[in-house]
UniProtKB/Swiss-Prot annotation:
Name this protein carries in UniProt: Putative 3-methyladenine DNA glycosylase
Pfam families listed in its UniProt record: Pur_DNA_glyco (PF02245)
Keyword set, alphabetical order: DNA damage, DNA repair, Hydrolase
Species in which this protein is naturally found: Agrobacterium fabrum (strain C58 / ATCC 33970)
NCBIfam families in the record: 3mg, PRK00802.1-3
Top-level EC class as recorded in UniProt: hydrolase
One term of GO molecular function: DNA binding
Family of the protein in this entry: Belongs to the DNA glycosylase MPG family.
One BP term from GO: base-excision repair
Annotated EC: 3.2.2.-
Listed InterPro entries: Formyl_transferase-like_C_sf, MPG, MPG_sf
Length: 193
């Protein structure tokens, strides 16, 4: 993928609806230290969304979701895999579902234990493992090291579909992906574009 990027993203970018942020992040460059790539898949979550961790209010686990916009909300899924979200308006966030790896690929392969490029970051848990995102980063600001986030100068073509791996609000079309990307966690259905 050959494209140019804007300067780093200001915190104000995140101080809006998570649906808008989730779409705008498609095609953005995201790095943690030297490992990173292009965001190719996201999902949006609102505080009034039954599938959201914020739906029942603030708890110690989801405290970062109610904190400042432009910070990470990191949690463990099923007690196994870390998942990374970008906090938007209070109680809303964007889940990073997949990245197309571009930098630090050898390091990501080592962390993931695979040489298959398409499997390095094709899912929230895989992405966090490859990029060494852990619960210690919960609440960390995205505009400070080790993070780098830059938006594409040109809007990407986006596919839209239902979110994955949830049991509530399953029909919300709040999953977004870079159209035609081979690096998404699950292909978008033809009727969901």
């Amino acid at each position: 993928m050959n494209q140019s990027f804007s300067p780093e993203v200001p915190q104000s970018f995140f101080q809006r609806d998570a649906l808008d942020v989730a779409r705008a992040l498609i095609g953005a460059e995201f790095r943690v230290g030297k490992a990173g790539g292009i965001i190719v898949e996201t999902e949006a979550y609102h505080p009034d969304d039954p599938a959201s961790h914020a739906f029942n209010g603030q708890t110690p686990r989801n405290r970062a979701m109610f904190g400042p916009a432009g910070h990470l909300y990191v949690y463990r899924s099923y007690g196994i895999h870390w998942c990374a979200n970008f906090v938007c308006a209070p109680g809303s966030a964007v889940l990073l579902r997949a990245i197309e790896p571009l930098t630090g690929i050898d390091m990501m392969k080592l962390r993931r234990g695979t040489d298959k490029l398409k499997l390095l970051c094709s899912g929230p848990g895989k992405l966090c493992q490859a990029m060494a995102i852990t619960g210690e980063m919960d609440g960390a600001p995205l505009n400070a090291p080790p993070f780098l986030l830059r938006l594409p100068k040109e809007a990407a073509a986006i596919s839209t579909g239902r979110r994955i791996g949830i049991s509530r609000a399953v029909d919300y079309p709040w999953r977004f992906g870079l159209e035609g990307s081979a690096f998404v966690s699950k292909k978008f259905e033809p009727d969901q574009r």
